[in-house]
Amino acid sequence: MVCLCFLGGSWMTALMLILMVLNPPFAWARDTPPHFLEVAKSECYFTNGTERVRFVERYIHNREEFVRFDSDVGEFRAVTELGRPVAESWNGQKEILEQERATVDTYCRHNYGVIESFTVQRRVEPTVTVYPTKTQTLQHHNLLVCSVNGFYPGHIEVRWLRNGQEEEAGVVSTGLIRNGDWTFQILVMLEIVPQSGEVYTCQVEHPSLTSPVTVEWRAQSDSAQSKMLSGIGGFVLGLLFLAVGLFIYFRNQKGHSGLQPTGLLS
């Protein structure tokens, strides 16, 4: 189900708010304080696209809802005593009721067609990263984090696998976090006691992906990790010496090119 809320609602909402405030039969309207707030909120609920649509319009006075229209009910209903004369008045006006009942099509289904391409059909692929919370040590408690970020829509499935088998115990999730830019993120953590040679995999399924994304993390001993770091350090050091050597070589070449043979006129 999809819910779209529009603060302020349709032109019909604005018209009825004006009628509600100015209509003499409503004694409470004449006694309103100098400063008050009237809000109308229109909500469209969609199931299976536009197969089933429900329209709800809420009228709020100073943060308290007092009357609403629900398309499933087909008429206005008072929420508080303040809304009772309003509901009775509007339900007695055939034109207003017919327009509200038609709003499911003229407002909800219409707007769905306008915004469907960049809301309902919008797809953004997630970025997946796996990392431990502590410096890796075998046979000690650790926490693996699978960070899934920047995806839309919010429906997503994240699983942890150990050596190809799904892990369910020790899995903790933050739940969906809104990034504020129409994308989401989620952190799914797995409690582990890593053993040498074990492979942990974070598997992500999302509507934007044609196939699941998997990111692996391998448990390594301290010696293996030290060897890997030494290898990386040696590689970087080798690149540094190569860069220095090339710099000296090209500088010397430039110096030789500036010399001229003896006796050559310039």
Swiss-Prot record:
Record's keyword terms, sorted: Adaptive immunity, Disulfide bond, Glycoprotein, Immunity, Membrane, MHC II, Signal, Transmembrane, Transmembrane helix
SUPFAM superfamilies for this protein: Immunoglobulin (SSF48726), MHC antigen-recognition domain (SSF54452)
Keyword Disulfide bond: yes
Record-linked CDD domains: IgC1_MHC_II_beta_HLA-DR
Residue stretches in coiled coil: none
Chain segments annotated as transmembrane: 228-250
Glycosylation sites: N48
Lineage: Eukaryota, Metazoa, Chordata, Craniata, Vertebrata
Superkingdom of the source species: Eukaryota
Cysteines engaged in disulfide bonds, as pairs: C44-C108, C146-C202
Location of this chain's protein in the cell: Membrane
Main location: membrane
Organism: Canis lupus familiaris
Name listed for the protein in its UniProt record: DLA class II histocompatibility antigen, DR-1 beta chain
Entry membrane topology: Single-pass type I membrane protein
Segments in the Cytoplasmic topological domain: 251-266
UniProt entry tagged with the keyword Transmembrane: yes
A GO biological-process term: antigen processing and presentation of exogenous peptide antigen via MHC class II
Recorded GO MF terms: MHC class II protein complex binding; peptide antigen binding
Family: Belongs to the MHC class II family.
Signal peptide stretch: 1-29
Residue spans, topological domain Extracellular: 30-227
InterPro entries for this protein: Ig-like_dom, Ig-like_dom_sf, Ig-like_fold, Ig/MHC_CS, Ig_C1-set, MHC/Immunoglobulin, MHC_I/II-like_Ag-recog, MHC_II_a/b_N
Domain Ig-like C1-type, residue spans: 126-214
GO cellular component: late endosome membrane; lysosomal membrane; MHC class II protein complex
Region spans: Beta-2: 125-227
Residue span of region Beta-1: 30-124
